Each structure stands twice: as structure tokens, then as C-alpha cells.
Regions:
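Short, conserved beta-strand element in jelly-roll/cupin
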Residues: 31-35, 44-62, 99-102
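A short hydrophobic beta-strand segment most commonly corresponding to one strand
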Residues: 76, 91-110
Length: 126
């Protein structure tokens, strides 16, 4: 796991793992797992993300709009746009392949990711 958080009060329960593509230099594919009826944190970052839903049901907030998610659906998150994902299924994890350009963006900007995420337990990291 490269990142995760759990906060019962905010209904946050998720983890992020790096998908294995050893030759990838600028793309950084990740598997996001969100527990049933839970969220990941509302956050933003410098890298772009393309979400492909592997399994489960939910919705993703991109800016001001909630968009439905189901297996096979795609969602795009532009740079520096506030976003959050919600698993709406009562029993099944929501699993998403997130393809990002984090490798390229972090090479240009340095390690900016920790400044834009919520600390464990729900306190802002930055």
C-alpha cells in the first residue's frame, strides 16, 4: 500500500496500491480500493487521473459535480481539481484503476503529494 486512510467519523476507508508496470516512466497506474459505503478523502493534486472502474458501484465528485461509477465506466480528474470518490454499495469494495501522470509531475515539481492529502485520522497534512 502506498497510501491509505481510515476515519470512522468521516466515513473514510480506502487504500491505494501501485499497479506493476515496470517499464512505465511517466505514467503511474494505481489500484484504489474503497470499502463499502465509504469514501476516500476529498483532495486535489498536480497530476491528472483517469479512473477505470474494475468492480463495484459508486460516484466520484469532480469539482462541483457527482458522477456515477459502475464497472467499465471512466472518469477524468484534471490537475488541481478537488475530487472525492464514494462507494455506494453496502457490501462490495469499489476497485478503480487510476492511471496518473504522477511520475512525470513529481519529477518536475518534486514530492508535492503529502502537502495535498489528509493526515491519518482526518487532520490536514499540509
Amino acid at each position: 500500500t502506498i497510501y491509505g486512510n481510515k476515519n470512522d467519523r468521516l466515513k473514510i476507508d480506502f487504500s491505494v496500491e501501485r499497479a506493476s508496470f515496470p517499464e512505465a516512466q511517466t505514467m503511474d497506474p494505481r489500484i484504489i480500493r474503497i470499502a463499502p459505503l465509504s469514501y476516500n478523502e476529498r483532495h486535489k493534486h498536480a497530476h491528472e487521473s483517469l479512473f477505470f472502474v474494475i468492480e463495484g458501484e459508486g460516484e466520484v465528485l469532480v469539482g462541483e459535480s457527482w458522477n456515477p461509477l459502475s464497472p467499465g465506466s471512466l472518469a477524468f480528474v484534471p490537475r488541481w481539481i478537488m475530487h472525492q470518490t464514494h462507494n455506494t454499495h453496502p457490501e462490495m469494495d469499489l476497485r478503480i484503476l487510476a492511471i496518473t501522470d504522477f511520475g512525470f509531475t513529481s519529477a518536475v515539481l518534486g514530492n508535492y503529494d503529502k502537502r495535498t492529502r489528509m493526515a491519518l485520522g482526518g487532520v490536514d497534512a499540509g
